Amino acid sequence: MSDLYIGLMSGTSLDGVDGVVVDFSGAHLRVLAHVNAPLSTALTHELLALNSPGTNELHRAALAANALVRVYAHVVAQLLELADIEHSAVAAIGAHGQTVRHQPQSFDGTGYTLQLNNPALLAELTGMDVVADFRSRDVAAGGQGAPLVPAFHQSAFGQPDQTLAVLNLGGMSNLTVLGPCPATESPAGVLDADPPSCFHSHDVLGFDCGPGNALMDTWCLQHIGQPFDADGAWAAAGRVHGELLAALLDEPYFAQSAPKSTGRDLFNSGWLTWKLEKFSSVAPVDVQATLTELTASVCATCVKRYGSESSTLIVCGGGAFNSHLMVRLQALLPRLKVISSQARGLPPLQVEAAAFAWLARNTLLRKTSSLEKVTGASGARILGAIYPA
């Protein structure tokens, strides 16, 4: 079996599709190619709309899934060209899909998670094996189905002599806390292809903190016509409104204990509109500053509660490029060193895509990937369904 895998990720931020080719042949994984492909405005709007109940949803969701998969196939073609490899050299594609509903419950029969995808079509378009549907087995086992990347974070960033925290700032924010890993001998910046021998669920904690970029991006698009706040410059020009921040923080989800997960089912434009009802006089730029402070505050609180022994906070995802947000995180966490994942050998936009390449590999090798302490499932499970070429 080949040691080359492709990972494809389109997250709740809806800022495009990230794809990577990863080589797992050596002691340490290597990313051979990375592509970021934007989604069309029409597809982005439809995927956003499908996060909420509407008319003719089944038909629209099927068409949106097909459209997304055609973007996936285009990304795969670009990756093969950049890496200068044939499709036959790749063992499988790990394709996450687009989460449009995430309502996990524990063992009561009502929990579900839905990622729009058509892995059969992707296998047909690429001529490659596809692994998809990574989350549903964990939900079936009573887990949250999210986050799934902490296991990968341990293999990629775990260190032998220190506790680390990894913060993914996508549409939502999720935190991983990694305990020391004595069996690891990899120096900082070197990424392990396989988990070290100390890799157990008790070494890793992970959960969704709350909103990441989603609310900030929504507000930006609505008021300045931009899909995101570049470098956080707009937020930096405003002032945090204390009463509005308190109202935003008055959300039961933030007080819940881990394991927990969330998404646009909760933190969406409707939630923001509701919270802003009593603050119509606040200038849009100050709302943006306050939304940025919300993300920073929620994430910092989670780090203090669950990762107080951490020496470093490694930030990945699109939010790592928001300079103002990174400054606020460092200010709220003065005892930690806040750095981009780039400093540890993996650029921020490659981390989640690489994680799904890693998860696909585990599926083919029949290795478990979920961590019961992270998701709350009844045990570790092999994740994903295989669609042969």
Curated annotation (Swiss-Prot):
Function comment: Catalyzes the specific phosphorylation of 1,6-anhydro-N-acetylmuramic acid (anhMurNAc) with the simultaneous cleavage of the 1,6-anhydro ring, generating MurNAc-6-P. Is required for the utilization of anhMurNAc either imported from the medium or derived from its own cell wall murein, and thus plays a role in cell wall recycling.
Pathway membership, UniProt: Amino-sugar metabolism; 1,6-anhydro-N-acetylmuramate degradation; Cell wall biogenesis; peptidoglycan recycling
Protein keywords: ATP-binding, Carbohydrate metabolism, Kinase, Nucleotide-binding, Transferase
Encoding gene, per UniProt annotation: anmK
Protein name: Anhydro-N-acetylmuramic acid kinase
Keyword Kinase in record: yes
Ligand binding (ATP): 11-18
Protein family membership: Belongs to the anhydro-N-acetylmuramic acid kinase family.
Reaction equation(s) it catalyzes: 1,6-anhydro-N-acetyl-beta-muramate + ATP + H2O = N-acetyl-D-muramate 6-phosphate + ADP + H(+)
Biological process, per Gene Ontology: 1,6-anhydro-N-acetyl-beta-muramic acid catabolic process; amino sugar metabolic process; peptidoglycan turnover
GO terms for MF: ATP binding; kinase activity; phosphotransferase activity, alcohol group as acceptor
Any Pfam family the entry gives: AnmK
